[in-house]
Amino acid sequence: MITLTHYLILSAILFSIALVGILRRKNLLMLFFATEIALNAVNIALAAFSKYYGDLTGQLFAFFIIAIAASEVAVGLGLLIIWYKRRGTIDLDSLQSMNG
C-alpha cells in the first residue's frame, strides 16, 4: 500500500533533483526544465496531502499551479527563442552582457 510518506519522499527527491538542476546548470533551457520539475514535485505533495486529508483544496492548488506553469513555459520559451536568434546562445553567462 502506498502511503502519504511514499508520496512525500518522491516529492522531496524530485524537488532535490530540481534544486540541484537550478543551482548547477548554465543553460537556460535546462533551468526551465528544472523549474518545471520543482513545480511538479510541489504538485505531487499537494495532491498527496489532499488525498490524505480528504479535501480537494490541494488538488485545486495543483491544478492552478499546472495552469501557471503552462503560461510560464509559453512565455519563457518565446523569450528564449528570441534570445537565441539574437545572441546565438542560450547560456546563462550570455545574460551578463545585457546593456541597460
Swiss-Prot record:
Q: Which residues cross the membrane?
A: 2-22, 29-49, 63-83
Gene Ontology CC terms, in alphabetical order: NADH dehydrogenase complex; plasma membrane
Write down the chemical reaction(s) this protein catalyses.
a quinone + NADH + 5 H(+)(in) = a quinol + NAD(+) + 4 H(+)(out)
Q: What is its EC number?
A: 7.1.1.-
Question: Which compartment or compartments is the protein found in?
Answer: Cell inner membrane
InterPro entries attached here? NADH_UbQ_OxRdtase_chain4L/K, NUOK/Mnh_C1-like
Membrane association type: Multi-pass membrane protein
What keywords tag this UniProt record? Cell inner membrane, Cell membrane, Membrane, NAD, Quinone, Translocase, Transmembrane, Transmembrane helix, Transport, Ubiquinone
Name it. NADH-quinone oxidoreductase subunit K
Source organism: Nitratiruptor sp. (strain SB155-2)
